A protein has these predicted regions:
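Transmembrane alpha-helices and adjacent helix-loop boundaries
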Residues: 1-213
Length: 213
């Protein structure tokens, strides 16, 4: 029975991996866009962006998933979005808002004197950001970004709310057959994957330790 259970859980876990990977693919760059919006000197854009981030961070991801999937049809009478698409959109927006605050904190932690020094050297704003600021920001945000990435691993289980067959749902199917251990077995998938990510992120953090800016 162990092999069939493992194969079934692997099917569910593959869907969890897809949600995880696609969310990171879209949310990391989108978070930077949101960050720039929240730091904009144009007040209406800045406050609109910060209000949006506040709403997303202050409401449950589960609620956002449900609204993303059912909302367009119930509110605007539009065709339902594919389940996977709704999941990726909701997850990406949610995590982009969290990442944007991490980016903003990293950028704002750089002393103003470094920007001024770049200007004295005749560098453009883009050159100052990419050649002076960026590496220091990356060094400072690796740990908090890592925490959010590990949280995302566990949050993928929320996708089952709108019918995505992820690993925990796969484990629950065996309860109908009188087996409870497959549900505990699903925890091993999360632990192993989270452990591997923790090791990789730890190595990245150590690699950047040489830079103390």
């Amino acid at each position: 029975m162990f092999v069939p259970v493992t194969l079934e859980l692997l099917m569910g876990f593959w869907k969890s991996i897809q949600v995880f990977a696609l969310t990171l693919l879209f949310s990391i760059p989108l978070g930077l866009v949101v960050c720039f919006g929240s730091m904009s000197k144009f007040s209406p854009l800045r406050w609109a962006t910060r209000t949006f981030v506040w709403i997303i961070r202050g409401t449950p991801l589960m609620l956002q998933l449900i609204l993303m999937f059912y909302g367009p049809g119930l509110i605007f009478d539009l065709p339902a979005m594919p389940r996977m698409t709704a999941t990726i959109v909701a997850f990406s927006i949610n995590y982009a808002c969290y990442f944007s605050e991490i980016y903003r904190g990293g950028i704002e932690s750089i002393p103003q004197g470094q920007y001024e020094a770049g200007q004295v050297l005749g560098m453009t704003k883009a050159q100052i950001f990419f050649k002076v600021v960026l590496l220091q920001v990356v060094k400072r945000i690796v740990a908090p970004m890592g925490n959010e990435i590990i949280t995302l691993v566990k949050d993928t289980s929320l996708a089952r709310i709108i019918g995505i067959y992820e690993v925990i749902w796969a484990g629950e199917q065996f309860i109908k057959k009188g087996l409870i251990w497959p549900l505990f077995y699903t925890g091993a998938f999360f632990l192993i994957f989270s452990g591997l990510l923790t090791i990789l992120l730890g190595k990245l953090e150590k690699k950047l330790d040489y830079f103390r800016g």
